[in-house]
A protein has these predicted regions:
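Transmembrane helical segments that form the transport core of multi-pass membrane transport proteins
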Residues: 220-308
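Membrane-embedded hairpin module used as a gating/binding unit in multi-pass transport
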Residues: 175-248
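Alpha-helical membrane segments and immediately flanking helix-loop junctions
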Residues: 82, 86-87, 94-100, 115-125, ...
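Structural signature of hydrophobic alpha-helical transmembrane segments
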Residues: 16-27, 78-93, 139-147, 174, ...
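Interfacial helix-loop-helix linkers and transmembrane-helix boundary segments
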Residues: 39-48, 67-69, 77-81, 100-115, ...
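Entry/N-cap segments of selected transmembrane alpha helices
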Residues: 32, 106-127, 279-305, 357-361
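N-terminal alpha-helical transmembrane segments of multi-pass membrane transport
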Residues: 1-72
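Alpha-helical transmembrane segments
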Residues: 164-182, 290-302, 324-328
């Protein structure tokens, strides 16, 4: 009888219940909240469902030495996590993004590239704020990139500069990507007048197939020469776009923007979620990172809208820019552009801003990768 009781006690010591703490419960609840919001609100479900479930997986307590934890060498999750730690996954995501992206709006309206560039100021604003809050320059650079609203770029840069903060930075970046409509809309309304919101922009010109093919080649050469350290992201982005636009690599483009990006998104989401273990994630540092991420995102939106208003001072009547597209300078494609469209139609149901907003939006994708390269070249 004693042997049976001892065996039961020994078994119970191996269960998750015996090792459960309130921190584990909090993190599991946060993971479930991510899943709930993704399903009920339809906020970035392709990102939040894997991340949320990964949080649940990563916070089930277990006895050390079982070779199942994400930080235990040789475990399945640890092997999958190598793609995040060593920066393999983000370039593959950029390959898929490139194969999905139509740069026509940017090619036909190159001046809107400046709005995408202006929005990157949020990254450097958060960098300065993080320095003042006690983070090292490398940590501050990794945190600042959250303002680009680009999860893969945030993972890529944090894996190089601050791997110990990668979980908090990645979750913060993806959370704010999901909250784009909630965060940006009030800022856009506060910064624009009714007359500005009613501005109708000229229909962009048609872009030839030749221009679409030349753009990724020239774009990559120029950006890579300026910021060689951003080549892994920029190269895959423009290569993916060339696959899409060349007309002779349809199968490769479909694979890049379909099955491949879906698989990599799942792997990134689950492994990043798993990495947010209670003892690592529930700290004052994580709270600071979330605050700085929000600050960076707000500054990026303000700079994008504000710069569009400044550009209007130099634009002739009839060629004005609707400043509502300024929010789209962040890299959240196409969510930020949809916010521009929705807010614009609230004021004028017949004013379609989506095609215009896509120009600074795709410029923001390029801009965030360039900004990451600049930060990496100085701090890496």
């Amino acid at each position: 009888m004693n042997t049976i009781i001892e065996s039961l006690q020994q078994f119970l010591q191996y269960t998750g219940f015996a090792n459960m703490t309130w921190q584990h419960i909090v993190m599991i609840c946060i993971g479930i909240a991510f899943i709930t919001v993704a399903i009920k609100k339809d906020w970035e479900p392709l990102l939040l469902v894997p991340i949320g479930f990964g949080m649940v997986i990563g916070n089930i307590p277990f006895t050390e030495g079982l070779q199942i934890g994400i930080y235990e060498q040789g475990s399945v999750m640890n092997i999958l996590y190598q793609g995040v730690q060593k920066g393999w996954y983000p370039p593959l995501i950029f390959l898929g993004i490139g194969a999905m992206t139509d740069f026509s709006s940017l090619i036909s309206q190159p001046r809107l590239l400046l709005i995408g560039a202006a929005a990157q100021i949020g990254i450097f604003g958060a960098y300065i704020a993080a320095i003042h809050m006690g983070f090292t320059p490398a940590e501050s650079g990794a945190i600042g990139i959250i303002g680009g609203a680009d999860g893969p770029t945030a993972i890529f840069l944090s894996s190089k500069l601050a791997p110990h903060l990668m979980g908090a930075i990645a979750v913060s970046a993806y959370s704010y990507m999901a909250l784009v409509p909630v965060i940006q809309r009030p800022i856009m309304l506060m910064m624009t007048t009714k007359n500005e919101r009613l501005i109708r922009m000229k229909t962009p010109r048609q872009v030839s197939q030749k221009e679409k093919i030349i753009f990724p080649i020239v774009g990559f050469i120029l950006t890579a020469l300026i910021v060689p350290s951003g080549m892994p992201l920029l190269g895959m982005l423009f290569f993916g776009n060339l696959l899409k636009e060349s007309g002779v690599t349809k199968r490769l483009a479909e694979t890049a923007r379909g099955p491949m990006i879906d698989v990599v998104t799942i792997l990134i989401g689950v492994t990043v979620g798993c990495s947010t273990q209670a003892n690592v994630f529930l700290t004052g540092t994580s709270v600071k990172i979330f605050f700085l991420g929000l600050f960076s995102f707000v500054i990026a939106t303000v700079c994008g809208v504000g710069f569009a208003k400044i550009m209007n001072l130099f634009c002739k009547e009839g060629n004005k820019i609707n400043p509502l597209i300024g929010n789209a300078g962040v890299s959240a494609v196409p969510d930020a552009a949809r916010v521009s469209q929705n807010v614009g139609r609230e004021c004028d149901p017949n004013n379609h801003l989506l095609m215009h907003a896509m120009a600074p939006n795709v410029a923001g994708v390029i801009g965030s990768a360039v900004a990451a390269g600049i930060i990496l070249s100085f701090l890496g």
